[in-house]
Amino acid sequence: MNRFISISFLSLIALTFVTLGTAIACDGENSDEAAIPRIYDPGKKLTIEDLQAVGFKKSKTYDVEGLVGADNAYYGFWGPDPYDRKDYEVRFFPSHSDAIELGTAQADERSGEDAILDKDLMSWPEGVKDARECKGDKGSGPVSHGVQSCKSPKYWDYSIYANMILLCSGGDIETARILCNDLLETIEPKTSDN
């Protein structure tokens, strides 16, 4: 009888963990539903002041000569944690359709695993140093060789929101999309479900 009770008890514990794990996994699937689409027109026109109003810190203003159709472009950083802010490149266009039609090719060129980071090969080389991330051994000492490559892409993806293209860092596409969405949600707060 005691053996039956202990087996039943273990089965109950196992069932609890399976149920809990399933509930957590299903809840995680719904998080994508709340994300702002990668290309989205909320029907408004943005400026750098809209980003600064939510805590975006502008580091550099880029010369947009050669950046097809863009009104202006900036390099800066943002994050909900002031000690863990991430880098972004922001490009503003006259309209949402201009951002899509004129800005997509150069955003593709600047982001992702196949980003073009050689100044001589880029269609718009402005800010190329800011678009690179250094990886490798940068230390010194008996084991270190001090070899470091600064040819890795910093921006892994982008969002086109209103008249803005937002290039986002992150180390991989999934993280970059999360970082894009995090910033965009401060501009476009979630509406409550009714």
Predicted regions and their residues:
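Sec-dependent bacterial lipoprotein signal peptides
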Residues: 1-24
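Generic alpha-helical propensity signal that fires on short helical segments
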Residues: 19, 106-111, 117, 177, ...
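N-terminal "mature-domain start" segment
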Residues: 27-80, 178-194
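A short, solvent-exposed beta-edge/loop patch
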Residues: 124-194
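Short, solvent-exposed recognition patches
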Residues: 48-146, 150-151
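Second-shell loop/turn segments in exported
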Residues: 34-38, 86-92, 163-171
